[in-house]
Amino acid sequence: MHLRSKTVQQLLSVILSVVMVLSMLPMEVLAQETPPVTTPMDLTATTEDTSGDGWSWTQSTKTLTLTGLTLTVSDDSTHALILPDGATIDLADGTASTLTGGSRSTVYSSGEVKLRGSGSLTVYGRGWRSATLDMFIPGTLTVEYDDPDGGAVLKTDEGTEGAAICANVTLDNGILRATGPDFASADDGSSVGLRGRLTTHGSSVEAQLTARTGYASYGLYFDKQGSGRGDTWTMGLGKVTAAAGHALSRYSYGLYVDYSSVNALELDGTQLTAMGGESDQYGSQGVFAGE
């Protein structure tokens, strides 16, 4: 009995030692991290359900569910993520996904894309080449609110030539943060937070549209993406902040309404804050409307 008791004590001592060693390890060593994906994802060519580390695709509903995807591609790739028209990006609760890279755009779609869920998505553009865009969706991006304490969040930074987001955007009780590029020279191009039509629905809407340094600087360049001139457009409930940065050669406008493509812009309950920045040669205004 004495020998058995001694053996048990030795085993307990070993177990305790292992526990103490594990407790001293950093949490990131113990955590199971999702490995990064380095190959561009083109879901327009997919005909069946498929999945990978941090993501899954449901073909019948065209739904991409992100559960902690880290997608990083090189500048040799034109786009990081390509989605079909009518696709939905579902951000799983409590997860954070990051998309990086692409010489022309990080996320591309030929039509409408809907973003929903209570997780977060961060998009970092790469490339900084002529006529490239951080995120280009020439349809409608819809952000749907799911979480009463947060909602889907889209953040863009390190944009390229032009706009962080070039799309007609609909916010339905969601949160949108778009930050344009920061150029050192006027020859590099203009900095725009969001270029396109912005529609807001719901008192929980928050849109933070920020431009930085460039040839010109516009927080929100309000025009119609696509051909033809649009009718009178209305922004509804929600908080919209449009802030311009430093314009090296042209104008710095918080909100610029392009009347060559939009007949008129009306605010229906919108809490709008528009701020112009510094302009080296031309004017700076919070709001400007013209052609």
Q: Which ranges hold each PLM region?
A:
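N-terminal secretory signal peptides that target proteins for export/translocation
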Residues: 1-8
